[in-house]
Curated annotation (Swiss-Prot):
Location relative to the cell: Membrane
Gene field: CYP71B22
Disulfide bond residue pairs: none
Family (UniProt): Belongs to the cytochrome P450 family.
Protein name as catalogued: Cytochrome P450 71B22
Organism: Arabidopsis thaliana (Mouse-ear cress)
EC number(s) given by UniProt: 1.14.-.-
Length: 500
């Protein structure tokens, strides 16, 4: 039976359901008129953040939509975001239950997608203590510095012959190696079961499916279940999850080998010890699903986001030679000539690099839509009534391009942050690459250190040029991705060893 026939047969039921579901009182935010059953889904393209941005130009900073029968509010300005993330942080800090997030979080036993409550708080505390604390950040400094040397050595081989470099692959390998050594105790350069190209494919496939649309989440009465299976979405989602879970099991099994040693204590070892001792975190027993849930968060969020940010930064620098020249001159003047190695002590000296990264976050947030929230009670945002159980999407892409916040918002101009109090740490709602409030990214400090150190190395040791015959206007800026948004076309540049 065709999908269209299912729609026709179930249409009367859905009309009744949709009418009952729609809030009937109070001043709701404005929004485009939806259709029965599908709501506003027909008005959304592949790029969800751009679709939201375009609609918000007509319907305002707080916009009401329906994904099928699920009410959704899209927030597109600093002021509205502050109301959600600060004023109503507690009432909006749980997550909607979605098919993909349930699967990849091992039934919400992670940190990023877990429902708000005591279990989530205890898991977050564990991750902060064992992975993201300031003590751990300092202790793992040697890993980040070692991997930055590996990156420089790889690029040097290409620079000697002026061979074009795919910076996507180079920077992904850098971030993946660091994150997996920090979190998993695994040095991928020495693992016999890890192929970096396959790891990259695994991350991209998992993130694509994590951000995929499941009709089951938004259509009632079993229709979504049927469509997901007819379309193949259900099968594709579960195959991707199985491949990721199999990789995690390899890492866990490697930890369990007799006599296996890591170069430091990692969260996998800590949680395995808790599982073996039947220890509790708060009120619950730690299980392998909790372990894999944390691994999923760290692996998918930590590996790709840093690489994406560095790629966009290098892309904008290639498009703006003035900024590139100014940045490299500052770096080399401050750090001096012929420095053999960059250390994290150098990061505090290079102020303009931080401005470039902030401007990159503004124009190219790795996750343009923060992880969705869900209201746990009725509340008001910008004077509009927001019913309980409404999904909230915060569009940092729109906020970063709001002319009320930013002069000439579409221009790449790091100087806009000179003497500006605005930072990315969750206290300024016009710049939210890591979110804010209770659900702010716990790995923020680690993530930004990885990005700063990687960029500092590639900009200090090498001069960069476009391939022969390519002009600045030829650089493709098209985006790709759902959960995180990367540069679709690889950034290929030619490195040259800097002549002192």
């Amino acid at each position: 039976m065709s999908i269209s026939l299912y729609f026709l047969l179930l249409l009367p039921l859905f009309l009744i359901f949709f009418k009952k579901l729609s809030p009937s009182k109070g001043k709701l935010p404005p929004g485009p008129l939806g259709l029965p059953i599908i709501g506003n889904l027909h008005q959304l393209g592949k790029s969800l953040h751009r679709s939201f941005h375009k609609l918000s130009q007509n319907y305002g900073p707080v916009m009401f939509l329906h994904f099928g029968v699920v009410p959704v509010v899209v927030v597109s300005t600093r002021e509205a975001a502050e109301e959600v993330l600060k004023t109503h942080d507690l009432e909006t800090c749980t997550r909607p239950k979605l098919t993909a997030t349930k699967l990849f979080s091992y039934n919400y036993k992670d940190i990023g997608f877990a429902q708000y409550g005591d279990d989530w708080r205890e898991m977050r505390k564990l991750a902060m203590l064992e992975l993201f604390s300031s003590k751990k950040l300092k202790a793992f400094r040697y890993i980040r510095e070692e991997e930055s040397e590996v990156l420089v050595n790889k690029l040097s081989k290409s620079a000697e012959t002026r061979t074009m470099v795919d910076l996507r692959k180079a920077l992904f390998s850098y971030t993946a190696s660091i994150v997996c050594r920090l979190a998993f105790g695994q040095n991928f350069h020495e693992c016999d079961f890890v192929d970096m190209d396959k790891v990259e494919d695994l991350v991209l496939e998992s993130e694509t499916n994590l951000g995929s649309f499941a009709f089951t989440d938004f259509f009632p009465a079993g229709l979504g279940w049927v469509i997901d299976r007819i379309s193949g979405q259900h099968s594709e989602l579960h195959k991707a999850f199985a491949r990721l879970s199999n990789f995690f099991q390899h890492v866990i099994d490697d930890h369990l080998k007799p006599g296996q040693s890591q170069d430091h204590s990692d969260i996998i070892g800590v949680m395995l010890d808790m599982i073996n001792k039947e220890s509790k975190v708060g009120s619950f027993q730690v299980t392998y699903d909790h372990l894999k849930g944390v691994m999923s968060d760290v692996f998918l969020a930590g590996v790709n986001a840093g690489a994406i940010t560095m790629i966009w930064a290098m892309t904008e620098l290639a498009r703006h030679p003035r900024v590139m020249k100014k940045l490299q001159q500052e770096i080399r003047e401050i750090l001096g000539d012929n420095k053999e190695k960059i250390t994290e002590q150098d990061l505090e000296k290079v102020h303009y690099l931080k401005l470039v990264i902030e401007e990159t976050f503004r124009l190219h947030p790795p996750a343009p839509l923060l992880l969705p929230r869900e209201t746990m009670s009725d509340l008001k945002i910008q004077g509009y009534n927001i019913p309980k159980n409404t999904m909230i999407e915060i569009n940092t892409y729109s906020i970063g391009r709001d002319p009320n916040c930013w002069e000439n918002p579409n221009d790449f101009n790091p100087e806009r942050f000179i003497d500006s109090p605005v930072e990315y740490k969750g206290q300024h709602y016009e710049l939210l690459p890591f979110g804010a409030g209770r659900r702010i990214c716990p790995g923020m400090a680690t993530g930004i250190t990885i990005v700063e150190l990687g960029l500092l190395n590639v900009l200090y040791f090498f001069d960069w040029s476009l391939p022969d015959g390519m002009k600045i206007e030829d650089i493709d800026m098209e985006e790709a991705g759902a959960f995180v948004v990367a540069k679709k076309v690889p950034l290929e540049l030619i490195p040259t060893p800097h002549q002192w």
